[in-house]
């Protein structure tokens, strides 16, 4: 994470003054412009962060309390842990599908991963694997046979025993389901003449053998992917369509109730296989679309924890003695997804014009208040095979105009930019981009959209441009590369961009056993992606979460899925 620049610090202090009512609009704008912020962006910041924006229903501004301490991520400390209690957690957008196989977004994944387990899971450090439902495994010398030895005595949350049959059912369903969104994890499985998966067998109830059609370097990492979650065969077989809103897994929590648009309630799995865990009795996940409303609720005692903290509020919230502010290391890459299927964004010169017209450091300063790093790749900084030789597109209006002049729309074009409604950060981001891009003739219309609708628009390619982000769910780049480049490997592929060299490298990279050669392949993929610019990678940022001081061991690993196994709350 980069240290905050002096400009970012100055902008942050100015926003805090606006929040406290210590500066009027005119003075704010004059000082913002002096810091290099445009009038319209400065106005957006003022409107978003002025004292009026933070008034409660009575009209009283929130009081900023001095004396709080920011808390960094740490190893779980269970010394004084008190079991029991309910964690009330706030988020901006509801889930829309709890099926590990057919879902397609973090609004689902980050929550149902508390319900389901995989044979192997990503460790809390986000960079290594560890045993889960499989205690151990062997890989044949030719890299085509994997033998998993299952943990004995495990049951699903309803008490049904977990066996190898559940693994075969879950993986076969994932491989054969026509609505599977994440087929890249299953590419190497053997298929019969009808395209149905084969080669997954169970010599006994506690052993699973997988015979691959070809060597597949990321297979063990792929086994930790959410779509490889183990579902109870007894619960789901013949009723798969109900898994959109029901669940039966071996994870630390089970699904008690889902009120669409309101709450998702998870309760402790009494049969969970990790002794003594989870500590909480339940987690109630509430949908509160407006970021500032969630802050009001946590300060008012209605919530215990929340995600998506506006960056500008962090300095203020760190001073609140009743709150803990977390900046968790993440794999989050924020970007603008561009629909490459249609004009004008099917033109690489138009896309590169937007790249050069985007001042990433200014975005970090005015949106994240310095808490972030300019993105150089669609892959997260420091990830396996991340290309550290790439540099961000320099902000250069002359180059942007030159690229636009070579495009089919030399005078620019109108562009609708969809953002998540209720997000101060996204409103400021969009306003800043509108200012920047206007210099090359791009007339941006900003369309705030409710979170679930925004996800639907993304899934159905109903957009020109849209703010978004992604995170690594596994430690191998196989996931993001498939997501970004291979339309047949993931229904989450949304840009419509096609490049034969990149696609060949993506496919060859999974079969290559030599890590050094894979590194070369994935570095080249990133170079091509950077040159073709099917989307605009903006910045890398940490997860910003807050809890009350009564919450302990709040977990948000780099891969994003919340880990509440060891979380506890003072009663």
What are these regions (language model features)?
Residues 1-27, 34-36, 49-52:
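N-terminal secretory signal peptides
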Residues 33-48, 107, 259, 268, ...:
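Detector for C-terminal structural segments
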Residues 71-72, 253, 373-406, 423-427:
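Structural transition elements
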Residues 90-141, 172, 246-248:
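N-terminal lobe/hinge region of extracytoplasmic solute-binding protein
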Residues 123-125, 216, 221-278, 282, ...:
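Gly/Pro-rich hinge or "lid" segments in bacterial periplasmic/extracellular proteins
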Residues 135-182, 209, 297, 344-346:
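Aromatic- and charge-enriched surface segment that lines or borders ligand/interaction sites
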Residues 149, 184-234:
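Surface-exposed binding/hinge segments that line
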Residues 151, 241, 270-316, 435, ...:
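Ligand-site clamp/hinge motif
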């Amino acid at each position: 994470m980069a240290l905050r620049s002096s400009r970012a610090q100055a902008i942050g202090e100015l926003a805090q003054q606006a929040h406290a009512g210590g500066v009027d609009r005119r003075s704010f704008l004059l000082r913002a412009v002096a810091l290099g912020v445009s009038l319209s962006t400065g106005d957006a910041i003022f409107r978003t962060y002025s004292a009026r924006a933070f008034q409660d229903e009575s009209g009283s501004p929130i009081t900023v309390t001095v004396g709080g301490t920011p808390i960094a991520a740490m190893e779980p400390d269970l010394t004084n842990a008190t079991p029991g209690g309910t964690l009330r957690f706030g988020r901006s957008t509801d889930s829309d599908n709890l099926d590990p196989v057919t879902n397609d977004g973090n609004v689902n994944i980050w929550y149902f991963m508390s319900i389901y387990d995989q044979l192997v899971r990503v460790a809390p450090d986000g960079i290594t694997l560890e045993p889960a439902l499989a205690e151990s495994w062997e890989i044949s010398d030719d890299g085509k046979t994997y033998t998993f030895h299952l943990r004995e005595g495990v049951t699903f949350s309803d008490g049904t025993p977990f066996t190898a049959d559940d693994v075969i059912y879950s993986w076969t369903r994932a491989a054969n389901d026509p609505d599977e969104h994440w087929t890249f994890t299953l590419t190497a499985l053997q298929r019969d003449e009808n395209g149905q998966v084969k080669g997954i067998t169970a010599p006994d109830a506690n052993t699973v053998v997988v015979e691959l059609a070809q060597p597949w370097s990321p297979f063990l990492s792929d086994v930790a992917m959410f779509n490889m979650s183990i579902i109870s065969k007894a619960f789901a077989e013949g009723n798969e369509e109900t898994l959109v809103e029901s669940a039966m897994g071996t994870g630390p929590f089970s699904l008690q109730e889902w009120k669409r648009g309101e709450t998702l309630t998870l309760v402790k799995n009494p049969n969970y296989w990790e002794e003594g865990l989870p500590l909480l009795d339940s987690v109630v996940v509430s949908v509160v679309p407006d970021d500032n409303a969630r802050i009001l609720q946590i300060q008012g005692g209605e919530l215990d924890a929340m995600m998506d903290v506006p960056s500008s509020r962090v300095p203020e919230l760190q001073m609140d003695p009743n709150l803990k502010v977390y900046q968790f290391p993440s794999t989050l890459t924020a970007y603008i997804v561009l629909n490459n299927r249609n004009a004008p964004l099917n033109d690489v010169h138009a896309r590169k014009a937007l790249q050069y017209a985007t001042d990433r450091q200014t975005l970090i300063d005015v949106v994240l208040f310095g808490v972030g790093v300019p993105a150089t790749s669609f892959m997260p900084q420091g990830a396996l095979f991340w290309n550290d030789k790439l540099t961000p597109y320099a902000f250069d209006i002359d180059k942007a105009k030159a690229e636009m002049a070579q495009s089919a729309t030399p005078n620019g074009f109108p562009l609708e930019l969809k953002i998540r409604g209720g997000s101060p950060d996204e409103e400021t981001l969009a306003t800043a981009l509108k200012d920047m891009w206007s210099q090359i003739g791009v007339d941006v219309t900003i369309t705030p959209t409710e979170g679930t609708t925004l996800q639907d628009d993304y899934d159905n390619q109903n957009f020109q441009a849209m703010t978004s982000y992604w995170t690594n769910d596994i430690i191998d780049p196989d996931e993001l590369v498939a997501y970004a480049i291979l339309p047949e490997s993931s229904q989450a592929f949304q840009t419509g961009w096609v490049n034969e060299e990149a696609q060949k490298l993506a496919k060859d990279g999974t079969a290559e056993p030599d890590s050094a050669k894979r590194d070369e392949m994935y570095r080249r993929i990133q170079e091509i992606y950077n040159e073709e610019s099917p989307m605009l990678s903006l910045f890398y940022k940490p997860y910003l979460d807050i809890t009350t001081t009564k919450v302990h061991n709040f977990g948000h690993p780099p891969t994003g899925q919340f880990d509440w196994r060891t979380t506890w709350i003072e009663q």
